[in-house]
Amino acid sequence: MKDLYSRRINYMRISITDLCNLRCQYCMPAEGICKKDHKEVLTLEEITDIVKAGVGLGIDKVRITGGEPLVRNGIVEFIQMISNIDGIKDIAITTNGILLPRYAEALKEAGLKRVNISIDSLNPDKYREITRGGDLSKVLEGINECIRLGLTPVKLNVVAIGGYNDDEIEDFIQLTMDKPIDVRFIELMPIGEASQWGKDRFISNEEIVHRFKNLVPMETEKSSPAKYYQLPGGMGRVGLINPISSHFCGDCNRVRLTSDGKLKPCLHSNHEIDILDAVRNHPEKIQEVLASAILSKPEKHDLLTDSHEESNRGMSQIGG
C-alpha cells in the first residue's frame, strides 16, 4: 500500500515489549520502567493477527524490537508464527545481544533471517558503565554465534556519543574488514532519556566521513535509512544513519506497532492510532485501522522545527 506521498509501505517494526535487561543511560532510567498490566499488552497471537492483516496491505518485511525482545516469553514460537504467514519475506530482530548465545540457533530454525545488535563500546568497562551493568563478553559471543549460524551480515548499531565512544569509531570500522559485519553509526536522537542526557554529546555522522577518508561510498537501497561505505577490500560495510543532520523521510517505508497496541506512523511524532480495541473487539477492522495509520504518515518529521513536541515515549517503548 502507498501512503499519501506515494511511498510504498511494506515494513512493520514491532515492539513486543518495553522491558529490558539493560539500563542504557540514553534509553532508560536506572530504576527501569513500570511494568504494564498484562491486559494492556498485546499477546503474541494478537500481534500475529495484525501482521496477517498487514500482509493484505503489502507488508512483507517485519522487524521485532523492544525494549529487549529476547526477554519476552515465547519469542522463538512467535518468530515461527510470523514465518508461517504467507507473504512475509523477511524477519529480522534488533537486540542488545546479551541473550543471543542462548537463543540464536533456535531463532534461526524458527525463521529469523537477520540480526541487528545494539553495542556502543568495545571496552568492557565503558560498556558496563553506559548499560549500567551489561556484560560485553556475552554480546561478543552472540555476534560470533550469529556469524557461525550464517545470520549475516550481522549489523551492529552504534550510537555515536561525544566524550564516550568517539575514540572507538576506528575500532568499530575495523571490524568490517575481515568479518561479515555491517557497523552502522546512528546519530543520538533526542527521544526520552536522551533528550536531556545527550544535549552536549551529539556527533554528526558527517564528522565520521571527514575523519575516515578511506571509506568508499556504496550503492544503497532507497528505503534504507543508512548510507553505506566500505573499507577497500573489506568484507562488511560501514553505515551512517543521520536522522538529525540528514533525514531519510522521503523514502520511509515503515509503520511501527508498540507493545501496548498503538500504531505510530512516524517515529518522531506523538501521533498514535489505537489498534488494541480492533484486535480484541472488532477483528474485521484490523486492516482498516492499519490502512488509516499508513495514510496518516506525515511527509517528514519535524524534529528541527519550532513546532516539534518532545516524545511522550522513551525509545524502549518504541523500539527505534
UniProtKB/Swiss-Prot annotation:
Q: Where is the composition biased (Basic and acidic residues)?
A: 300-312
What are the recorded Gene Ontology BP terms?
A: Mo-molybdopterin cofactor biosynthetic process
Per the entry, which co-factors are needed?
Answer: [4Fe-4S] cluster
Write down the Gene3D superfamilies for this protein, in alphabetical order: Aldolase class I (3.20.20.70)
Q: Where is the Radical SAM core domain?
A: 4-227
- Pathway listed: Cofactor biosynthesis; molybdopterin biosynthesis
Q: Where, by residue number, does [4Fe-4S] cluster 1 bind?
A: C20, C24, C27
Annotated positions binding S-adenosyl-L-methionine: Y26, G67, S118, M189
Q: Which residues take part in binding [4Fe-4S] cluster 2?
A: C249, C252, C266
Repressor is among the record's keywords: no
Which of the seven top EC classes does this enzyme belong to?
lyase
Pfam families (UniProt xref): Fer4_12, Mob_synth_C, Radical_SAM
The UniProt entry's coiled-coil ranges are none
Q: Where is this region: Disordered?
A: 300-320
Gene Ontology molecular function terms on file: 4 iron, 4 sulfur cluster binding; cyclic pyranopterin monophosphate synthase activity; GTP 3',8'-cyclase activity; GTP binding; metal ion binding; S-adenosyl-L-methionine binding
Q: Which UniProt keywords apply?
A: 4Fe-4S, GTP-binding, Iron, Iron-sulfur, Lyase, Metal-binding, Molybdenum cofactor biosynthesis, Nucleotide-binding, S-adenosyl-L-methionine
Which sites bind GTP?
Answer: R13, R63, T94, K155, R254, V255, R256
Catalyses which reaction?
Answer: GTP + AH2 + S-adenosyl-L-methionine = (8S)-3',8-cyclo-7,8-dihydroguanosine 5'-triphosphate + 5'-deoxyadenosine + L-methionine + A + H(+)
User: Which E.C. number(s) belong to this protein?
Assistant: 4.1.99.22
Q: How is the cofactor bound?
A: Binds 2 [4Fe-4S] clusters. Binds 1 [4Fe-4S] cluster coordinated with 3 cysteines and an exchangeable S-adenosyl-L-methionine and 1 [4Fe-4S] cluster coordinated with 3 cysteines and the GTP-derived substrate.
Note the subunit structure.
Answer: Monomer and homodimer.
Task: Report the protein's function.
Answer: Catalyzes the cyclization of GTP to (8S)-3',8-cyclo-7,8-dihydroguanosine 5'-triphosphate.
So what family is this one in? Belongs to the radical SAM superfamily. MoaA family.
Entry protein name: GTP 3',8-cyclase
State the organism of origin.
Alkaliphilus oremlandii (strain OhILAs)
Q: Which gene encodes it?
A: moaA
